[in-house]
Amino acid sequence: EVLGQVQVDPAILSRTINPNIVAKAPGMKYRHYAPKGQMTIVEGKTEKVIGEINRLCREKMLEGHSVAVIATEETETRYQCDNVRSVGSRRTEGSIAAGLYDILREMDHIGAEYIFAESFEQDTLGKAIMNRMLKAAAYHVINV
């Protein structure tokens, strides 16, 4: 069976928390799954993302903060940070979607004050992953 046109709610597409948009469900608007630490998503080409996250990690660690990175299986060994966690493989976005909640909770368990995360392509499942991540990060995004 084929569905007709699918419309995405404006609360999901918004890149800011807009008080004028009424959320139909808690995960559509608010800092859903948000870790206690300040989370920032870094977007761009892989090499630049890795370089920027490593720079940010060094900066925050030198200031004495607890820092963590949310990476993928493909890149996790390339980060120079005390706490690097893989959320899954880019080859199977389902593994990322399935592991996202647990990895965000783990950030609280390790006491991460600053969390830097890779971004994901916003195609089918990637759009849902990024929606949750953007809300968890309160829309803190760096483009490199």
Predicted region positions:
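Conserved catalytic/binding loops enriched for acidic/polar residues
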Residues: 13-16
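A conserved active-site cap/scaffold subdomain adjacent to cofactor or substrate pockets
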Residues: 1-10
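A C-terminal functional module that forms or caps the active site or interfaces directly
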Residues: 21-138
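Short, flexible loop segments at boundaries between secondary-structure elements
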Residues: 141-144
